[in-house]
Swiss-Prot record:
Bias (Basic and acidic residues) ranges: 83-97
Family: Belongs to the SPC25 family.
Additional notes on this entry: Present with 3280 molecules/cell in log phase SD medium.
Full protein name: Kinetochore protein SPC25
Lineage of producing organism: Eukaryota, Fungi, Dikarya, Ascomycota, Saccharomycotina
GO cellular component, one term: nucleus
Principal place of residence: nucleus
Species name: Saccharomyces cerevisiae (strain ATCC 204508 / S288c) (Baker's yeast)
Residue stretches in coiled coil: 9-112
Keywords: Acetylation, Cell cycle, Cell division, Centromere, Chromosome, Coiled coil, Kinetochore, Mitosis, Nucleus
Presence of the UniProt keyword Coiled coil in the record: yes
Length: 221
């Protein structure tokens, strides 16, 4: 009878763990979607700015052509004063400078659009790869290390790894951008934290990180 109760308790714990993992992964996926939407909105805005600059360049080119025709006519007209002719040249020079400035801005925006497009492709690839691997890895670590995965206390993108049943042995990691080691209980000394960050960020080995972190935390209790 005791073994049946223990199995039921384990089943409830597994259900709770799966719900916790689903919530954490859902938040991470929602953040990735928001980043992608933001990139797309920025790209639309940049496209609009780029098109506006192209239209402005065309308008300035038309004005410059008309002004050059006026200059030529002024040079031929016997009643055109030297001051008026100089004024036309000054205006033509100003339009030429503005046209050059807008052309440079257009090239910069075009380069930025290409960069943002590449970033969107990379973001989609990371999101697809991460969403496919997280659930299986977390389930394996839970069985091997008595691990639970909970949301972090300070940031929606942080994850708290809890070892054991009493919630006194845990460590938090920022899961977006560079993986940064956060708070832990018990607190770890700087040397231990540096070791964990090396395993996670340099070696990129999440499994090794969880094993080493668990051993360090249990040894410090």
């Amino acid at each position: 009878m005791a073994s049946i109760d223990a199995f039921s308790d384990l089943e409830r714990r597994m259900d709770g763990f799966q719900k916790d993992v689903a919530q954490v992964l859902a938040r991470q996926q929602n953040h990735a979607r928001q980043q992608l939407q933001q990139f797309q909105a920025e790209m639309r805005q940049l496209h609009n700015q780029h098109q506006h600059l192209i239209d402005e360049l065309q308008r300035l080119a038309t004005q410059r052509t008309a002004l050059q025709q006026q200059i030529h006519a002024a040079q031929q007209a016997t009643n055109t004063t030297r001051e008026q002719w100089r004024s036309y040249h000054e205006r033509e020079s100003e339009l030429s400078r503005r046209q050059s400035t807008l052309a440079a801005q257009s090239r910069e925006l075009d380069s930025l659009l290409q960069q943002r497009g590449k970033e969107c492709v990379q973001l989609r690839a990371r999101w697809a790869a991460q969403s496919g691997n997280d659930a299986a890895e977390v389930a394996l670590y839970e069985r091997l290390l008595q691990l639970r995965v909970l949301p972090g206390a300070s940031d929606v993108h942080d994850v708290r790894f809890v070892f054991g049943d009493d919630s006194r042995c845990w460590i938090e990691v920022a899961m977006h951008g560079d993986h940064v080691i956060g708070n832990s209980h018990p607190a770890l000394d700087p040397k231990s934290r540096a070791t964990l960050e090396h395993v996670l960020t340099v070696q990129g080995d999440l499994a090794a990180f969880l094993v080493v972190a668990r051993d360090m935390l249990l040894a410090s209790l």
